[in-house]
Amino acid sequence: MVYATMKPRVAALVLLFGVALDVASFGDLRAQPTGTQVVTRGPARAVWTRERAHAWADSTGWLVGSNFIPSTAINQLEMWQATTFDPRTIDRELGWAESLGFNTMRVFLHNLLWQQDSIGFLSRMDQFLTIADRHHIRPMFVLFDAVWDPMPHLGPQRAPIPHVHNSGWVQSPGAAILADTASFEQLRGYVQGVVGRFGKDRRIVAWDVFNEPDNTNRPVYLAYEPIDKEAHSFILIRKAFVWAREMNPSQPLTAAPWRGDWIDPTRVKPFTAYMLDSSDVITFHSYDDSANVERLVTALERYGRPIICSEYMARPRGSTFQKIVPIFARRHVGAFNWGFSAGKTQTIYPWDSWDREYTAEPAVWFHDIFRSDGAPYDAAEVAFIRGITATAGRR
């Protein structure tokens, strides 16, 4: 991600709505829900062999979809909490995804949902999977996320800051836990409860262990981040991979590099190297143009594993469906663009909306494909997506 300097009006709103923190929200997560475990904990399994990874890829076919949150939710908590869970909108919008030929979606979870109501949370996940399966969509679930607001809280979520990109998205875990490495063990129950419940479920295609774990969100939320965030995230991601592997899921585990140089093997940072070496299948993020995407894919091919781009598509940066998706289709790289239906996340606005004031919809949307009523932002773009997914085929 690229962030610009936060303007005073936004800083004030973040302070007002984001810093008020209910410490009770970070209680003990170790309790397991009764009667929901379908996978038992054992020794952590090894990283898949390349042969097993490619057998999995052969069974899934070319994966293509979006990062998904319903238009009625501002963040992961509003999507999944019982009072705001919206299966009707989810069903409608996943129907639009099916109409594009999408067969997967990347969907974010949150540790606080487990703490709040583990059994109810698992039930809503199961309901989501039932809806997705009806539309022939197998999601990739994201367990942790280090991007945007580091002060999540349960209950009602704040309203969007007008015209500001992702103004209410929250990190998982928040800064209160991430700052204290001694507290990490309380997250084990969440990881193993979720992966244990769904680790053999054919409706799930993969698990993304930690989204952009070394993202310091500078300068938007930098002042509210743990001082040693990157080091602490490195500790947590290593634990999280072990916790997930102890449940022996049948789906692959992965975590995506998103910054730095991984084209030159001698310049790969230890954090990035760990994510790549620990992933059953390789994922990465790129909002760059087609030339750089080609270089990144070529570099990642040295790992000899299936490759998925789990974030791309920022139209003003040259990362468009028409320019990027043909590369992925030709090279059999899975593809998840950022943004699906325009709504409370407001990701039609660019990253610089944290600094530059917008008062109306931008002429060129940054992310997203559909308006909240199902009308496409760009009919020609939607026709292109349908054409290439039909040509590439869905297995």
Feature names for model-found ranges:
Residues A11-D28:
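Bacterial N-terminal signal peptides
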Residues V38-V281, H285, A291-N292, Y303, ...:
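Active-site mouth of glycoside hydrolases
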Residues A383, G387-R395:
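Catalytic domains of carbohydrate-active enzymes that cleave complex glycans
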